[in-house]
Amino acid sequence: MIKYMRHIFIFIVVWLAAGTICSFAQYKPDRLGEGFEAKTIAMPDDYSGKVVTTLVRSLSSCDTHKAVLYVHGYNDYFFQKTLARTFNDSCFNFYAVDLRKYGRSLLPEQTPFEVRDLQEYFADIDTALTLIREEGNTDIVLMAHSTGGLITSLYCEAHRNDLPVQGLILNSPFLDMNMNWFYEKILVPIVSAWG
């Protein structure tokens, strides 16, 4: 009898856990309104605790296997409905990722934008690309703005031998500090060494 009860208990725990994980990872209507859905995905914890990333999508009415994944910049999140609609009208499924500790992915106890290395965002991009492919998209282009341009450029460089996307579109990428010679070669190294 005890063995039978133990099996029932284990079944109930597994069933509840699976239901919780599945309900957490389902698309739900997004704050952008009609035609936009968001899915929040639990990621492995980092040095500050729990981490999530959020995938927002707007699907084209065309029968298409093409998609764009948009990566926002610093102190930002995805809100550009017109951008998504423009890609949808051009027969692209549109996706955007709110990176960990930004926008929809910022949890109450977190410090906004806190990462120690930009490569921490690669897991968010990999997760988004995997989900986009699982939804039947085979031709995927990354698009990024500002610091997202720096992150995606580093991502593509790190994956140069097995690039998981067909292209990269950069919108006003943050690739350089744009300082004069004195600041860049003299002042910044002194201030950096000083701490």
What are the roles of these predicted feature ranges?
Residues 74-75, 103-139:
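Catalytic nucleophile-loop/oxyanion-hole region of alpha/beta-hydrolase
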Residues 1-26:
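Bacterial Sec-dependent N-terminal signal peptides
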Residues 76-84, 88-109:
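Conserved alpha/beta-hydrolase
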Residues 65-73:
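Short beta-strand element of the alpha/beta-hydrolase
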Residues 147, 151-195:
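Alpha/beta-hydrolase-fold enzymes
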